[in-house]
């Protein structure tokens, strides 16, 4: 099916002011203590290695257990759908909106990341999905509370666009237990290594948006 250009509608909608239609969004919410505890137990129990599917230079990346994705979706599913809906509105400058009654977010796959000293994730993006995410379960003190607030050790950085004036092409977040980020699957991101003891424990999930099953 050929999609008609949005140009005429955008032109008519934009009456004046300042327009920022190009930047991809990043969503953030806070996970419940109960879900964090559940995921930490699942991380310890998982014996399947998911690392062979990933770009990370990280030894321990266990796969989700059978029901883990469903449990997480009970808490984050609506937020993921809201994030997708906000993207539709932003990309179309308010012309189009998602019909939340007929659509749902689904987990494509998920895995844990048990990062240790000197391990890292190179710049990469995700495939076979529409959105990706990361949630933090345990963070070493030297990452959470660094002596130098500009220290990037253990941080995640997202990168997009061509470096030039008046444009932000990179944004960095310091991991905090309970923080959960959602972003477009094609958005490049990297995780920096850190020094010292401790484990930087996190999980990642990929999502897609689809029409609801009539029986759901």
Show the residue positions of the predicted features.
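C-terminal "cap" of GNAT-fold acetyltransferases
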Residues: 201-203
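Catalytic core of non-heme Fe(II) oxygenases with the double-stranded beta-helix
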Residues: 105-182, 190-192, 199, 209, ...
């Amino acid at each position: 099916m050929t999609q008609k250009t949005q140009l005429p509608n955008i032109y008519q909608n934009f009456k004046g002011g300042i327009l920022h239609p190009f930047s991809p969004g990043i969503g953030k919410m806070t996970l419940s203590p109960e879900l964090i505890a559940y995921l930490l137990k699942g991380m310890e129990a998982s014996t399947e290695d998911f690392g062979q599917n990933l770009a990370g230079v990280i030894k321990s990346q266990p796969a989700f257990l059978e029901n883990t994705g469903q449990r997480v979706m009970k808490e984050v599913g609506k937020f993921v759908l809201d994030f997708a809906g906000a993207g539709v509105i932003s990309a179309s400058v308010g012309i189009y909106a998602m019909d939340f009654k007929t659509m749902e977010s689904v987990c494509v796959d998920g895995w844990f990341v048990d990062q240790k000293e000197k391990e890292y994730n190179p710049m990469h993006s995700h495939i076979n999905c529409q959105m990706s995410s990361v949630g933090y379960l345990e963070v070493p003190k030297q990452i959470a509370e660094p002596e130098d607030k500009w220290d990037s050790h253990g941080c995640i950085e997202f990168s997009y666009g061509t470096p030039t004036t008046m444009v932000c092409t990179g944004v960095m977040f310091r991991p905090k237990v309970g923080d959960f980020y959602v972003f477009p699957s094609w958005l490049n991101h990297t995780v920096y290594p850190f020094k010292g003891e401790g484990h930087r424990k996190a999980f990642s999930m990929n999502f897609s948006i689809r029409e609801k099953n009539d029986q759901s």
